[in-house]
Amino acid sequence: MFNRIMVPVDGSKGAVKALEKGVGLQQLTGAELYILCVFKHHSLLEASLSMVRPEQLDIPDDALKDYATEIAVQAKTRATELGVPADKVRAFVKGGRPSRTIVRFARKRECDLVVIGAQGTNGDKSLLLGSVAQRVAGSAHCPVLVV
């Protein structure tokens, strides 16, 4: 059924739920589990057009990447604690726009399913579906399960 399941993580409660669901599906299917954490790199153009908050510009990319790596490693550790064999789970960190990076990663790695949290770290609780989950669901080449 599924050979490669991808779970994007960002440290949010929604991502934890998605990881747990992804682990359950991995255990049912024996699929490989790919965990991806995307850190957002802010371009000079975005900065000059004031598309980002000033405090976001103060965080260097290395610090963002380190933080994303920590989140990805914690998610991988949690997946193995929940019973995924170590040789069946891999963690990745990429820089870029989250929705676009998730969709590209899923296509490049030939994922059969993306399991994503409905709300991420920037989630507005009043919204039914977060913008990243909505964009991924609308543009991924494979089925997307929103948890």
Curated annotation (Swiss-Prot):
Disruption phenotype: Deletion results in an enhanced uptake for ectoine by TeaABC. This is TRAP-T-associated universal stress protein TeaD. Pfam families: Usp. Keywords: ATP-binding, Cytoplasm, Nucleotide-binding. It comes from the Bacteria. ATP-binding protein that negatively regulates activity of the tripartite ATP-independent periplasmic (TRAP) ectoine transport system TeaABC. May regulate uptake according to the ATP status of the cell. One of its GO terms (molecular function) is ATP binding. Its main location: cytoplasm. InterPro entries: Rossmann-like_a/b/a_fold, Universal_stress_UspA, UspA. It is found in: Cytoplasm. Signal peptide: none annotated.
